[in-house]
Amino acid sequence: MPTAVLSNQTAFESYTGIDLSMDMPMIAAEWKKRKVSFDGIYTGYLSGVSQVEWVEQFMQEFANPQTKIFVDPVLGDEGVYYRGFGDEMCQAMKKLCGKADVITPNLTEVLFLLGKKADLKAESQNLEQIRSYEKQLSQLGPKTVIITGVSQGEKIWNIGYSAKEDSFFEVSTQKTGEGYSGTGDILTSVICGCMIKGESPQKALKKAAAFLQASIEEAVEDKTDPNEGVAFEHHLSLLFD
């Protein structure tokens, strides 16, 4: 479902775009006529509260008991909200997380969703503390919580929690290069695809992290502008067993 069309991603010095909020109901109506169904529904950036509320309605209409729902609760990064977002958007996203099977927030988003100050000092990134945050987030409703991109020394950690099994799983990779745009989107997209194929969250996260690491290493070697993202296309074979 297209929610907006952008000329380029928003980290560049300028961009233009078209909000498709008014078109989304018409697209959904056409899909409903054709009895479209989905193995998975995956939400990423949503432009505001009204889009979040509409997506909830979309899930009610199009999800069936077998549909896996993934929510990447895009709210902010580096301790601050993205432009135009605030507490109202956070509350709407919190409600949406309650509809999900899997959520994949970064640490800033975790703290916002839990109503905490977004302090990203070392004590906030203690791995034991993060595991406790995951348990708290699971109480919103998702079966699996994966907190992404946690920086610890020379490592980047992605830490998962299965509410059903009351167990944690995690993958760390070497910190490489600068922060590249779109890496969180790639990680969640691979997790989503793998789990819809029937793979476990643990295997999906491991595969996604390895794929992303290889893509970042190529971007570093090629001296790619971080705003351009990473060259993931050359590494798609890593996603196939």
Annotated model-derived regions:
Residues 1-71, 75-83, 234-237:
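Conserved N-terminal subdomain of the carbohydrate kinase-like
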Residues 23-26, 95, 132, 203-211:
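A non-catalytic, amphipathic alpha-helix used as a structural packing/dimerization or gating element
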Residues 47, 75-77, 109, 151, ...:
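Active-site-proximal loop/turn and secondary-structure-junction residues that shape catalytic pockets
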Residues 83-168:
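Conserved phosphate/ATP/ADP-binding segment of small-molecule kinases
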Residues 112, 178-201, 205:
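Short, small-residue alpha-helix embedded
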Residues 167-181:
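Short pre-catalytic strand/loop immediately N-terminal to key active-site residues, enriched for Gly-Thr
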Residues 202-241:
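Charged C-terminal helix
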